[in-house]
């Protein structure tokens, strides 16, 4: 399911919608959270409309979460809240890009916020610097989901250790779930890998392998019959030195010192 890939430990999630479906954004994100067991009491949304013009609306959101977290000891609140922000197009109608970036950064640093979701449709961004604003949101996001078409999406995930993964998936929407399958031939999201059978583990190297690791019968016999110089034999024997004279050796049987007067 798509929720297995989106609802993770990554805190700031940016959804880039190439299909212009902003109207389903809150319902779509809420369904992903519910699939992962996130209760309604952990999902909070920022008011939309003219109220976004007032900075107090944003401040009240952060203060509310802080007060709820300190005044309650339930398990749902102790893990933090899931914040669903208005679409980026709505935010830009009332606030500057600098304010939006600062607010996103505050939510990212807040201990009372578990995840932040922001939906952006590039075609709906009327700002002349829309490309730079969207790039700034991607920089702040730890997970970027791009809906490229009805059957294709991509996912960029940044991990705390600095690693980045970029994968593409084919998607299939049914009445009950949003199923995705990696385009590189991997298993669908949420599927457990199949355990290999013992017979498959015992298979030998294919004949087309360029590196031969097995010996045939004749090679095994030749290897066993070979005795290396440093090998120890099972039968004890005395040490003998055998010298075979060469043809150039000149031995004189007479004593060369016989003629000396000593």
Swiss-Prot record:
Query: What pathway or pathways are given for this protein in its record?
Result: tRNA modification; 5-methoxycarbonylmethyl-2-thiouridine-tRNA biosynthesis
The family database entries (InterPro entries) matched by this protein are listed as: Elp5
Extent of Acidic residues compositional bias: 246-262
- Name a single GO biological process: tRNA wobble uridine modification
What span is annotated as the signal peptide, if there is one?
none
Similarity section: Belongs to the ELP5 family.
This chain belongs to the protein called Elongator complex protein 5
Record the organism: Drosophila melanogaster
Q: Which gene encodes it?
A: Elp5
């Amino acid at each position: 399911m798509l929720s297995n890939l989106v609802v993770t430990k990554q805190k700031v999630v940016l959804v880039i919608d190439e299909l212009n479906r902003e109207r389903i954004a809150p319902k779509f994100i809420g369904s992903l959270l519910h699939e992962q067991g996130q209760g309604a009491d952990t999902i909070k949304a920022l008011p939309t409309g003219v109220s976004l013009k007032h900075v107090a609306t944003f401040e009240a959101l952060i203060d509310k979460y802080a007060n709820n977290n300190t005044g309650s000891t339930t398990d749902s609140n102790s893990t933090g809240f899931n914040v669903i922000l208005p679409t980026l197009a709505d935010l830009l109608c009332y606030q500057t890009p600098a304010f939006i970036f600062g607010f996103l950064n505050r939510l990212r640093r807040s201990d009372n916020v578990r995840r932040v979701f922001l939906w952006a449709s590039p075609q709906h961004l009327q700002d002349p610097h829309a490309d730079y604003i969207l790039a700034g949101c991607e920089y702040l996001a730890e997970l970027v989901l791009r809906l490229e078409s009805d059957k294709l999406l991509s996912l960029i995930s940044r991990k705390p250790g600095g690693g980045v993964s970029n994968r593409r998936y084919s998607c299939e929407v049914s009445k009950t779930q949003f199923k995705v399958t990696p385009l590189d031939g991997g298993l669908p999201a949420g599927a457990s890998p199949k355990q290999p059978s013992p017979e498959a583990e015992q298979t030998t190297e294919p004949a087309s392998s360029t590196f031969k690791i097995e010996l045939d019968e004749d090679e095994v016999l030749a290897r066993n019959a070979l005795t290396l110089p440093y090998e120890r034999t099972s039968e004890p024997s005395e040490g003998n030195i055998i010298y075979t004279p060469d043809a150039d050796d000149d031995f004189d049987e007479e004593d060369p010192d016989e003629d000396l007067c000593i």
